[in-house]
């Protein structure tokens, strides 16, 4: 029970402020939805205006979306200074994607001067906000000793946490560490489980890693058909090594009937996705330079998932 009018008045003011904050947040979220709808329609002028309103009403994702538009020049003139400004606002408003974007920019020197301490700072903030991208990126930095003292234990811990936050890339990385005994005791069962999770989260590299385990029978029964399907899924998810492995299976007839046309088709896709091994094979097999393959691959309408 409140024993004095002073305390009671303070409580009333607190409740009024809470209601006001709720109304502001609700209004800000409405502007954010309006901005997103405008962006999808291609009405970038309105999108910017509504994102700004939502950002000014302290909706962090509104600030982040605006930062992304300015960083990529998506519907607006590219402006890195504005991108950093809005990402900072978004991060300060506890949007983990904004923190991750700042971390990435400072880690790579993408439009800003490279600054690893700042990258680590923003990744840590994003990870604290349960952002899988930030936790995973920080894990990679600890694994490689980039801007921090190399620490496999921290790398594994952060990567596991990122995987639990549905960041598939980190699931693949955890699997890699267990499969190859990188800073941890080799454990193929754990490797398999993490590759499966990453593939389920639509990380192409995880699907390829899982496919390899089925192809060679690593802690699972060897299964060429399963390997092929996983490689195809990796290819569909834009992983060049997945396309390449499908091509190799069709070219050699390993686990599937030989099919040179399908092999060449997948080699083209692998090359287009930047997998140099596919480009090299194509030059040897059909004598085409990798630069000449872009149109061929784009015109190839074969469904990777079939």
From Swiss-Prot:
Q: Which EC number(s) does the record attach to this protein?
A: 3.5.2.6
Where would I find the TPR repeats? 28-61, 96-133, 168-205, 240-277
Which cysteine pairs are joined by S-S bonds?
A: 55-63, 91-99, 127-135, 163-171, 199-207, 235-243, 271-279
- This protein's UniProt keywords: Antibiotic resistance, Disulfide bond, Hydrolase, Repeat, Secreted, Signal, TPR repeat
Q: Which EC class, in a word?
A: hydrolase
Pfam families referenced in this protein's UniProt entry, alphabetically: Sel1
As for what it does, the entry says:
May hydrolyze 6-aminopenicillinic acid and 7-aminocephalosporanic acid (ACA) derivatives. Binds to penicillin.
Q: What is this protein called?
A: Putative beta-lactamase HcpD
Organism this protein belongs to: Helicobacter pylori (strain ATCC 700392 / 26695)
Lineage start: Bacteria, Pseudomonadati, Campylobacterota, Epsilonproteobacteria, Campylobacterales
């Amino acid at each position: 029970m409140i024993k004095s009018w002073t305390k009671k008045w303070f409580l009333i003011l607190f409740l009024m402020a809470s209601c006001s904050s709720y109304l502001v947040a609700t209004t800000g979220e409405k502007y954010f939805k309006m901005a997103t709808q405008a962006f999808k329609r291609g009405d970038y002028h309105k999108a910017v205006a509504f994102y700004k309103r939502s950002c000014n009403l302290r909706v962090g994702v509104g600030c982040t979306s605006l930062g992304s538009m300015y960083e990529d020049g998506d519907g607006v003139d590219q402006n890195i200074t504005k991108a950093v400004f809005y990402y900072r606002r978004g991060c300060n408003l506890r949007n983990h994607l904004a923190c991750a974007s700042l971390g990435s920019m400072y880690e790579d020197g993408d439009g800003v001067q490279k600054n690893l301490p700042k990258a680590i700072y923003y990744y840590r903030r994003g990870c604290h906000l349960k952002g899988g991208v930030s936790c995973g990126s920080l894990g990679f930095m600890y694994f490689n000793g980039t801007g921090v003292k190399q620490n496999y234990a921290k790398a594994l811990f952060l990567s596991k946490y990122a995987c639990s936050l549905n960041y598939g890339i980190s699931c693949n990385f955890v699997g890699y560490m267990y499969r190859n005994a990188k800073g941890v005791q080799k454990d193929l069962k754990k490797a398999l489980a993490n590759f499966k999770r990453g593939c389920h989260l639509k990380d192409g590299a995880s699907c390829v890693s899982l496919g390899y385990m089925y192809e060679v029978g690593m802690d699972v029964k060897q299964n060429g058909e399963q390997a092929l399907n996983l490689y195809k899924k990796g290819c569909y998810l834009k992983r060049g090594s997945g396309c390449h492995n499908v091509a190799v299976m069709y070219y050699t007839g390993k686990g599937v009937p030989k099919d040179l046309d399908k092999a060449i088709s997948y080699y083209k896709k692998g090359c287009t996705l930047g997998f140099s091994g596919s480009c090299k094979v194509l030059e040897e097999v059909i004598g085409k330079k990798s630069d000449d393959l872009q149109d061929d691959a784009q015109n190839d309408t074969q469904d990777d998932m079939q």
